Amino acid sequence: MDIILGVVMFTLIVLALVLVILFAKSKLVPTGDITISVNDDPSLAIVTQPGGKLLSALAGAGVFVSSACGGGGSCGQCRVKVKSGGGDILPTELDHITKGEAREGERLACQVAMKTDMDIELPEEIFGVKKWECTVISNDNKATFIKELKLQIPDGESVPFRAGGYIQIEAPAHHVKYADYDIPEEYREDWEKFNLFRYESKVNEETIRAYSMANYPEEHGIIMLNVRIATPPPNNPDVPPGIMSSYIWSLKEGDKCTISGPFGEFFAKDTDAEMVFVGGGAGMAPMRSHIFDQLKRLHSKRKMSFWYGARSKREMFYVEDFDMLQAENDNFVWHCALSDPLPEDNWDGYTGFIHNVLYENYLRDHEAPEDCEYYMCGPPMMNAAVIGMLKDLGVEDENILLDDFGG
């Protein structure tokens, strides 16, 4: 009898707890539809279910806000202005938003929970962002760890981007084995040296990342990206490799790939100032886009130079492109510096790190380096070194433009 009574009491306690939870849920979790008012325009209003994040609700309604980290709160790009209904700003957002901006309603859409009706404000250019399913034209190695992914836009469509802009690319859940990569013989030495073929990328959910475009607006119907494979660092070889780069490197001719865009803010200023471009690694992409746009589309007569840093001759690419532009335009010159040239390179050009080469061979004797505009994109250490050098020369922040892809 005691056992039966104990079972009955336990069951009653469990039922009571369930009822308490259900009651609390009914009070704390909103039910029914909620409305997101956008830019005070009734035609843009979004009706959705509560729960989830604002970024996802906007995407579900076909409004694609830039989010290079895929909604993780780390990139700080998905800024919107929440005028009401967003709740208190979270500590994760304050890493990217100042207290003053927070008072004005600035929020990260990926961190705003959908609990009640909301009134938000979005930049008008957001409504020009679209999504396309593209076809892979080619995906070739341009350097040991860099591929050029070339995508075909669907017939009759176009991506109305500006030079220096970027798109977001989607990777589905996947299992990629590096051993299946087709690495050309000239690049295999380092892959085998660092035992990279042992890696695999196993991902169970969709991922979104941002990449700057290497093509310029008059290269119609295509999107070109320079993608560096994100392998684990040598001092920590057991961490997982990069999700998106692993997926992109697995793509083959004819495969389908979903992108959205265009996005961007790394645009050239409309001035007559001298332009100095500084790049390294996959930071080549926006450099190529900008320089081609200035010289081929705009026929700019501004004085400009391009300084690119590579490890060895094997890591140089688009050489023929820039040689052609230099031959055709008296106002453009370009230089490459190798930090670790190989004996077989027979290199007689600049050597060392690109910030030192730029300073020693040009800016040190420049009559007014502070008057130039500097456009740069490369690995974080390169960016920091170049910016430090420019600051020492008295260059103001407004003349230093950085496409900071974080690596």
UniProtKB/Swiss-Prot annotation:
Domain of life (superkingdom): Bacteria
Topological relation to the membrane, as annotated: Single-pass membrane protein
InterPro entries per record: 2Fe-2S_ferredoxin-like_sf, 2Fe-2S_ferredoxin-type, Beta-grasp_dom_sf, Cbr1-like_FAD-bd_dom, FAD-bd_FR_type, Flavoprot_Pyr_Nucl_cyt_Rdtase, FNR_nucleotide-bd, NqrF
EC number(s) from the headed UniProt entry: 7.2.1.1
Binding site for [2Fe-2S] cluster: C69, C75, C78, C110
Molecular function terms, GO-annotated: 2 iron, 2 sulfur cluster binding; electron transfer activity; FAD binding; metal ion binding; oxidoreductase activity, acting on NAD(P)H, quinone or similar compound as acceptor
Positions of the 2Fe-2S ferredoxin-type domain: 32-126
UniProt-listed GO biological process terms: sodium ion transport
Catalytic activity annotation: a ubiquinone + n Na(+)(in) + NADH + H(+) = a ubiquinol + n Na(+)(out) + NAD(+)
Keyword Ion transport: yes
Keyword field contains rRNA processing: no
GO cellular component: plasma membrane
Location(s) in or outside the cell: Cell inner membrane
Record's comment on post-translational modification: The N-terminus is blocked.
Region named Catalytic: 272-389
Subunit structure: Composed of six subunits; NqrA, NqrB, NqrC, NqrD, NqrE and NqrF.
Described function: NQR complex catalyzes the reduction of ubiquinone-1 to ubiquinol by two successive reactions, coupled with the transport of Na(+) ions from the cytoplasm to the periplasm. The first step is catalyzed by NqrF, which accepts electrons from NADH and reduces ubiquinone-1 to ubisemiquinone by a one-electron transfer pathway.
HAMAP family for the chain: NqrF
Annotated NCBIfam families: nqrF
The protein, known as: Na(+)-translocating NADH-quinone reductase subunit F
Species assigned in the record: Vibrio alginolyticus
Gene that encodes it: nqrF
